[in-house]
């Protein structure tokens, strides 16, 4: 059932980025997703704040309707990071073995990844480099 959803809407740049971490550093897919998701949420938040607000309201934060977009993004990202920390997931791309000198190669591969077109916001190679760097 999840696959049907993926094929209808795409997966976006979280998966474009984590596929590279798995391929290059043998990082488990779920761990890589947990590391990359908060950074990409901040990036996509510029065009997804209303969706984030709706999710926050539905997970018990009715006050989210009164928050400005930046506070919605920050609150949602914080919730995701807290969950990740609570279950003991590593928090940085550095923990996968990634080094600064690898970022351009990872970004090139992420640009070519089939999941990229499903992202709600356009992304460039430079964006990918910056996103990986922010996740370090």
Where are each of the predicted segments found?
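Histidine-centered catalytic micro-motifs
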Residues: 11-18, 25-30
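Flexible, glycine/charged-enriched surface loops at secondary-structure junctions
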Residues: 8-14, 66-70, 90-96, 103, ...
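Short, amphipathic C-terminal "tail helix"
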Residues: 99-136
């Amino acid at each position: 059932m999840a696959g049907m959803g993926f094929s209808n809407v795409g997966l976006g740049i979280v998966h474009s980025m984590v596929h590279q971490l798995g391929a290059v550093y043998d990082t488990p897919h779920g761990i890589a997703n947990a590391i990359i998701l908060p950074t990409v949420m901040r990036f996509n938040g510029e065009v997804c704040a209303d969706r984030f607000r709706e999710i926050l309201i539905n997970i018990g934060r009715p006050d989210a309707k009164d928050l400005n977009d930046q506070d919605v993004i920050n609150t949602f990202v914080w919730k995701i990071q807290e969950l990740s920390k609570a279950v003991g997931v590593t928090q940085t791309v550095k923990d996968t073995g990634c080094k600064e000198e690898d970022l351009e190669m990872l970004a090139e591969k992420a640009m070519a990844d089939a999941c990229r077109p499903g992202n709600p916001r356009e992304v460039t190679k430079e964006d990918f480099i910056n996103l990986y760097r922010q996740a370090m």
